[in-house]
Each structure stands twice: as structure tokens, then as C-alpha cells.
Amino acid sequence: MSKNSGKDKAKSATANKTIALNKRARHEYHIEERFEAGLALQGWEVKSIRAGRGNIIDAYAYVKHGEIFLIGAQITPLIQASTHVVANDRRERKLLLHRSEIDKLVGKVERDGYTIVPTAMYWSKNKIKLEVALAKGKQTHDKRDAAKDRDWAIEKQRVMRRGNRDA
């Protein structure tokens, strides 16, 4: 065992923790609550994700027979992946959640008109986790207001920086 193996492991674990982010979800939805879910993956999918070939931008989750599935997430297979398994890069993937979390999500989706969107995919204790959010869709004027607020915050920062230089 090398002298710095513990430090190297800690640095590499924190540096490569996030696999994929869904920035579009923050723009398109009002995010109410977040949940951590496991993913039921095949071996080639884990290998592809390790190589950085996971994408959750167009993904969403839906309820089917009391279970929650992720659809639209793209995991591109590696060229040297196994040939005896047919690799479908956009297949349905089951989300692994506690029953109480599933019941809460199902109730909100069916009664209150919420949707379930993935916001991040990351490593946690050598397992791939998906952060899903309970969200409501934004209307066009909400998106414009958010953009206006963001632009104003940037402009305020510029003015403050200029003011600090003059003083």
C-alpha cells in the first residue's frame, strides 16, 4: 500500500462524483422536493457510465403498476461491449426507492399534476444514484421572469465590482 493511497482515493472520489446533470430541469420546472433513487442497470450500462457516456437531459420518470421507471435517459454502449446482449441505449430503467417515497411520488403525480424529472446522476459508495425531483412545469412568463432576475443579479454584481474598484 502506498503512502498517499488514502488521499488519492478521497480526491478521485470527490472529483468524479457527478456523472451527469440536467440543467434544463431547473429552467423548465419549479422543483418542489428531491429524492435519491437507485437505478436497476445492466453490466454494459455501468461500464458505459464509468466511461462518461450517460445523458439525462431528455429523461423523465413515470409510474407504471406502482413502480417508477426512468425513460429517455441515454447511455451509449461502448464499442467493445458484449455482443450477446442487445444494447438499447434508451430503454426503460427501474428506479429503486423506498415504498413510502414511491407512494408519495405517485400521489403527487396522479392527484396534483406534478411530474418526476431527473436532476443529477452521481456515484455514492460505488453505486450509481439518480436524484429525481418532484416538479411542476413553468409557464413561459415564469421562464422570462427567471431569466430577467438572473440577468439583474449579474448586472448588480458588475456594478458592485466597479464600485469597489473606485473606492
Swiss-Prot record:
Protein name: SsrA-binding protein
Task performed by this protein: Required for rescue of stalled ribosomes mediated by trans-translation. Binds to transfer-messenger RNA (tmRNA), required for stable association of tmRNA with ribosomes. tmRNA and SmpB together mimic tRNA shape, replacing the anticodon stem-loop with SmpB. tmRNA is encoded by the ssrA gene; the 2 termini fold to resemble tRNA(Ala) and it encodes a 'tag peptide', a short internal open reading frame. During trans-translation Ala-aminoacylated tmRNA acts like a tRNA, entering the A-site of stalled ribosomes, displacing the stalled mRNA.
NCBIfam families per UniProt: PRK05422.1, smpB
Domain of life: Bacteria
The keyword Cytoplasm is assigned to this record: yes
HAMAP family per the UniProt record, alphabetical: SmpB (MF_00023)
Protein family (similarity comment): Belongs to the SmpB family.
Record-level GO BP terms: trans-translation
Family matches, as InterPro entries: SmpB (IPR023620), SsrA-bd_prot (IPR000037), SsrA-bd_prot_CS (IPR020081)
Subcellular location: Cytoplasm
Native source organism of the sequence: Stenotrophomonas maltophilia (strain K279a)
Entry GO MF terms: RNA binding
Any Pfam family matching the protein: SmpB
Keywords, comma-separated and alphabetical: Cytoplasm, RNA-binding
